[in-house]
Amino acid sequence: STVAAAALPLMAQARTAAYSAAPQMVPMKAQYAPGQLLILPRSHYLYFVTAPGQAMRYGVGVGKAGLEFTGTATIDVKKEWPTWRPTNEMIEREPQTYKRFIGNTDAQPGGPGNPLGARALYLFQNGRDTFFRIHGTTQPNSIGRSVSNGCIRMLNEHVIDLYQRVPIGTKVTVL
């Protein structure tokens, strides 16, 4: 629709170049305030608005169809090398994959082998954890694809950069 197209960053409306996950400064519609994050799952990009009409664009991996987050949230928690545990829904969907987590409260310690990667930004709505995250990954080939259980994945070096830029309380919009 025209309204939806008007909300998109200028570069996302008519992408003619090949997909690139590399951070790049791009033009952005002025309706988004500096400091906000905008995520466009269909184009696999996250935009950090740096100034009116300008944003740093990062390539991301997003949730599989039916598992993706949409709407607005705030970053209420930030963690370096976070621990990880699959959600109960993930365990129910794929019990064979996550069988070591059935019937316990175990969590995988943070570190290079952890699926959340080097950093995680925890998305909340009205003070409640959504269980969706913007995080690093151990699967760099998943960037630019819709393969996750719903979270927004970034290359570790990119999520470290973003982590340093965004404070607690940052508004996140996923269209």
Describe the role of every protein-language-model region.
Residues 152-153, 157-175:
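N-terminal targeting pre-sequences for secretion and organelle import
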Residues 17-132, 161, 168:
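Gly/Pro-biased beta-strand-loop elements
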Residues 135:
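Histidine-centered active-site/metal-ligand motif
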Residues 1-13:
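N-terminal export signals
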